[in-house]
Each structure stands twice: as C-alpha cells, then as structure tokens.
Amino acid sequence: MGTAKVTTPLVFAITIATIGSFQFGYNTGVINAPEAIIKDFLNNTLREKSKSMPSEVLLTSLWSLSVAIFSVGGMIGSFSVGLFVNRFGRRNSMLIVNLLAITGGCLMGFCKISRSVEMLILGRLVIGLFCGLCTGFVPMYIGEISPTALRGAFGTLNQLGIVIGILVAQIFGLKLILGTELLWPLLLGFTIIPAVLQCAALPFCPESPRFLLINRKEEERAKEILQRLWGTQDVAQDIQEMKDESLRMAQEKKVTVLELFRAPNYRQPIIISIMLQLSQQLSGINAVFYYSTGIFKDAGVQEPIYATIGAGVVNTIFTVVSLFLVERAGRRTLHLIGLGGMAFCSLLMTISLLLKDNHTWMSFICIGAILVFVAFFEIGPGPIPWFIVAELFGQGPRPAAMAVAGCSNWTSNFLVGLLFPSAAFYLGAYVFIVFTCFLVVFWVFTFFKVPETRGRTFEEITRAFEVQVPAGSRAEKGPIVEMSSIPPSKDAV
C-alpha cells in the first residue's frame, strides 16, 4: 500500500463537503440571537391579520414551534439519507439537496416582507430537512475518500464545520451586524450563500471511489480518483479491499433499517452508534450554553453575549485540538477522556451554582467549569460520534446505519430542547446532576463496548464484530478476528 499524502484535491473535496456541516451549525445557532425581534414580528403579524392582540400563550407556542420544527425536519431528513446516497451517490446527493437549503433560505429571508409567519416556520422545517440529510452525507463522504491513516483527523473536520457555523451565527446575530429589526431576515436567509457556493464547487469534487467501485462496479474510475486524491500510484491494496467488500455485498441481502437490528452481526455496531450519538446530545452541552449567559451576567460580565461567543471560540479551538489528537490517541481514548472530564465539570458546575449566591467568587469557578466542559466536549463527544458510525459499517449497511444514528441524534436533541426548560425550572442547579449520571453511564458503556478503530480498514472493523456472532447467524461466513487483535494498517503507523 502506498503512503497516502494530504493532497490539494483531497483537501478541496473535504472543505467543500464540510460546507454542509457549516450549514447545520449555522442554522442551529442562528435563531437564538434575534429571539426578541422575531417574537415582535410574530406579534405584529398576527395582530395585523386577526385585528386583535395575540395571547402570550399563542406567541410562545409559535416561537417554540419555529425553533423545534428545525429538529423535526432534521429527524425526517436524517432518516432519508439512504434514499439519496444509494441512488445518486454521495457527491451528487450533496449537490441535489442544496435546493432545499436555497428554498428554506428564501422562505425565511422573505417572510418579513411577505408578512407571513407560515413562511418562517416552513422555512425552518425545510432547512431542517436539509441539515438532517447533511449530517449523514458529509461524514459518509469524508470517511470514504480519506486515507485510513487520516480518516479520523479528516472526520473531525465535520464537527469543526458545525462549531464554526454556530460561532458565525452568534457573531452575525450581534446587533452591530445582522441582529437588528431591519436585517434579521438577512441573518436567516444568509444560508443561501453557502448553498450556492457548494453547488458551484461540488462538480469539481470527485464521487466517492468506494461508491463507484462497490455500488457501480467502475473500478478504473475509482482507481484513478484514489490516485489523484491520495497522491500515490500504489492503491492496489485499497482497490482489492473494496473488491472484496463488493463481493461480500453481493452475497448478502440488501440491508434495511430493520435488518440492522435483526442481523446479529449488525446489532452490536448499531447499538454502539446510537449510544455514541446519545452521549453527545445527553451530555448537557446544550444546557451549558442555555445557562452560560445568565452565569456570565452574575459574574459581572457587562455583555454576556460576548462571553457566550468566547465559549464558542473555545468550542472551535478544542475541535482543532481534537483534529490533531484523534489519530494519535485514538477515538475510544478521546471519547473516554471527554466524557470523564465533562462529568467532573458537570459536578463542579452543580456545586458552584448552588453556592454562588453566598460566595460571589463561585461564579468565576462556574465560568471556568463551563469553558473546560466545552473543551472536553470537543475533544471527544463532539466530533467522534459523527464519523465513527461510518467506520463501524461496510458499504452495504452504511447508509441505513447513518440514517438510524443521525435520526437518534436529532430525536434526542429535540427531546432535550423540549424537556430541558421544565427540568431546569423544577430542579434548578441540580439539573446538571442528571447530566452527570448520563455521562457516567456513557463512560462505562464506552469503556466496555466501544472498540478502537484507529488505523483499521473498513473491512477489518466489519470482520472484527463478527467474532461474537455464532457462525450460523452471520450474513456471510469467513475468517474472523478479535477487534483487539487487529493491528493498525501500515499507513497509520
């Protein structure tokens, strides 16, 4: 196997793909800053149409719907990943669904001038559909075009795109920029620009060579793309691995979502995938950002929004740190470190929140705990769940697995957003004890059940899971080895 290099075509393709990740992050964070302004828009529009003052309950319900409908769209979109990637390919799927981003951006951008609450809500739903699809497309594409030795580092770029998107949304949402009564439609409609940029650039990116060889049987084209992307002529071993997987796929029946749970050789990796996604959303990261503005204010920070943006900067910096660590320390190790550090910080936040009224210096302890909590999140639970799912499955079950994992992430995100305000109201600072318990459970699960995938090919990882499956239950028989016994590929050394 030739030594793969970081080439310009590879960096270009991954950068263009992560525009989809940026879109997800941007549209997640963009709705928060102009909350009061959008509520005024809802109030004025409803009053004009009904000729009467809308109730506070109706306004709150419409605002909540505007926020939550994004996650509903994400759930539907993420579950539809397989419908696109198997038919159109990875690259073409990313290209096609930008129509949703442009449509959603137009609906939101023109809702004010049209005096239409319905356009705002529909736009959020459509952009949610788009982002849900992107959470499947982007990690899958990056994982399939990256050399084995760099797959984790490049996979982390998906999360980097997300956190940069959130940070840009926070900055653009400032009153000095687009967070004003006049310009907030531009803030929401900005999502059109990255969509158009990605549409213009994607035709210059290659299709996934794994898709071309395994799904389309285009071996020569796949070989040519691999050589160009990896900067080496010696890709014979990688091509052979894909051909072996293609033969393996031909011997198995088509993998559906139900088959992932029924087939013994898929059951363990899909459970791991779901648990890793839950470890991200149930870690308490959204709760920390929910509390952060108030905590910064209590600590005497004059403009808490800038401190929250500072937390977003920490978010971004430690995602970059994770990028350099993931191929050295490994996925499993970083995930364990992240979960353990977050559990400690969560406990520290509970104590400091309970004592800050009696001891003002405790507010600064809490701020420190928040920033370190965010740092630990981006070392492990932030980036790793997104790309490790693509590593745990072969070409056949991968689209269905990405759909299930993505849907579980979006669903848990939706439920946390729905239930957290009530939990915070009744439990106060003790709400972080709940997240601490979740973090401990996920740490134990990761320690005992999650394998290390660093430096291993897709074929090696897939084979390793079959060791626990009785021979008669496997979809296909063949040589099997323990996950712990697989040596990393030479590229990874």
From Swiss-Prot:
Residues 33-64, 112-118, 175-183, 291-304, 353-363, 421-429 are extracellular. This is Solute carrier family 2, facilitated glucose transporter member 3. It comes from Sus scrofa. Interacts with SMIM43; the interaction may promote SLC2A3-mediated glucose transport to meet the energy needs of mesendoderm differentiation. Residues 1-10, 86-90, 143-153, 205-269, 326-331, 390-399, 451-493 are cytoplasmic. The modification Phosphothreonine is found at T232. Deoxyglucose transport is inhibited by D-glucose, D-galactose and maltose. Galactose transport is inhibited by D-glucose and maltose. One of its GO terms (cellular component) is perikaryon. Belongs to the major facilitator superfamily. Sugar transporter (TC 2.A.1.1) family. Glucose transporter subfamily. One of its GO terms (molecular function) is galactose transmembrane transporter activity.
